[in-house]
Curated annotation (Swiss-Prot):
One of its GO terms (cellular component) is cytoplasm. It is found in: Cytoplasm. The gene is Tbce. Keywords: Chaperone, Cytoplasm, Leucine-rich repeat, Neurogenesis, Repeat. It comes from the Eukaryota. Residues 31-75 form the CAP-Gly domain. SMART domains: CAP_GLY (SM01052). LRR repeats lie at residues 155-180, 181-204, 209-232, 235-258, 260-284, 285-310, 315-337. This is Tubulin-specific chaperone E. GO terms for molecular function: alpha-tubulin binding. It comes from Drosophila melanogaster (Fruit fly). One of its GO terms (biological process) is microtubule cytoskeleton organization. CDD domains: Ubl_TBCE (cd17044). InterPro entries: CAP-Gly_dom_sf (IPR036859), CAP-Gly_domain (IPR000938), LRR_dom_sf (IPR032675), SDS22/Internalin_LRR (IPR050836), Ubiquitin-like_domsf (IPR029071), Ubl_TBCE (IPR044079). The keyword Repeat applies.
Amino acid sequence: MVGIIDEVQLFYPLGTRIKIGDNYGTVRYVGEVSGHMGSWLGIEWDDGLRGKHNGIVDGKRYFQTQTPTGGSFIRPGKVGPCATLEDAARERYLNYDSSNVDESLIREAQASLQASLFEVVGMDKIARKQSKFEQLEEVSVDQTPVNAAGYLKELTHLTTLNVSHTLIWNWEIVASIAQQLPSLTNLNLSSNRLVLPTSSQITELEPSFRQLKRINLRSCGFSDWKDVMHTALLWPNILSLGLQENSLGQLAEVDRTKIFKQLHELDLHRTNIMDFDQVTKLGNLTTLRLLNIMENGIEEIKLPDCDSQEKLNIFVSLEQLNLLHNPIWNEADAFNELDKLPQLKRLSKTPHLKSNFDEMFSKAVASIASLQFINKAEVTAEQRRGAEYDIWKKYALDWMQATQGGTDSLREFCRRHRTYPLLVKKYGSPADFVPRSQAKQSNLINVSIRHQLTGETWEKKVPRMITVQTLQGLVMKRFRLSGDVPQLCYVDALHPDLVVPLDNNAKTLDFYSVQEHDTVLVQ
């Protein structure tokens, strides 16, 4: 019995991955179970509800699981067969089983018969397929029982490899794959549970990964950022790292003399990082251009303080930030904080429940001076001018009160509205606008509606709460327009150089701050 158990232990080292049906698990124990004959494998299932216990049977602990019902004992014979990456790739891309044809025997037969034209049926077809196999640039063997490399040196053109959801369970296996593929730059290891490498293993294996530029470790069971940083010592030249769906929770500052020296992209989607203070710990990643922190439950964006006319010396290269599906409760404050980032050009964010995309777009554009795209929508010069002008008018009274309240009052205003001093430089002092905003407003306003093509002008008294869509209907009727609905914009009577598009048909003139004697242009 001891010999049999030793053989099982040799075949299933602790940490080995197994698959039964659609269920994946990790070997946590190999040996006897009291009261039961033979050798057993103690399995911790990826699905924490799949098992029957937590590693304790009849009061004795054999192994430990993360969930109360994550463990089971199974017979070794229940575990299905494994495969090499070589065999899995050939089967998927050639539909060819090498055991059916012994190519060396065929070549011997050709030589012995001295028949240069000797041909075995199907051999030419296999040769053509083999040629295509060698030229493959991308290979995916996801959802296969791969747990070893095999012979891969023929794949000299391979740049992208997907071995997600396989049975690869340690970095020695990954290294034996990578070292045979000199052109490999993109590696997807998602949904594999890999044993943490030792320091000596990292020293030994690191040369095998020097060509790697992009690696995806989605749902690989990481729960400690320190383990990520330790493992990252394997990839000295990594540019893009995916850690989606690993429950990290907390982060720590990175030692850039050792890891992430060239990192451009980091994906922390759904990693349970609920506090933005944790995100700022990565601010010393000076080469980072893209950061994805969507679906993390972040409610507030808070960055270190800096003067309103300055930018922070963190995330100095960050151009793209993904905040989608985080319950950020104060959009205006969040955008004001993000203006502190020196290079932010692209932002993705879900509108607040009490907001909509157009309102969010306007706030973001006016509050983040460097922003060029939001949710993939490009910010045009006209849209920026309109958004900035709305903010310029909205806080005109607050600005005037702050300037009259002394240095501290003005500093506090600029802290809460970082871009406002820039808007004053751009559009002038809002002092002459303040009396208009303070005065008791009539429900009706007189506006001049001018057709730009014909020059015809229509003086009209309209309700402040009239929608753009209703006004478009009146304009079409008055100017006898047919065909496409005309585009409208307005010019502030006191600042005729500012042209603001009325680009949301559902909004009112009051929303756009159209005032008495302003001009509406029909385009």
